[in-house]
């Protein structure tokens, strides 16, 4: 079974998304983070499920209603680990730069 882990940046992204939702849709904030984390669990059994986007990166689409989230990750087949690099809402333009 593949292990998966959040990078510090991905953890920050989840915190940023939670803060945004607390300000705009408080009733959905924590449920949304749970939804994202639960969706990432699919990587344990299917680490290549995300669409390849080049440079060894993949993107997992996480549906929520009429929109959803995208998780950018890299799967290291040799070590059987999927590292979640970034998480963003589908309506955001690109991933935050650090």
Where are these regions (language model features)?
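Enriched for short, Lys/Arg-rich terminal
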Residues: 64-98
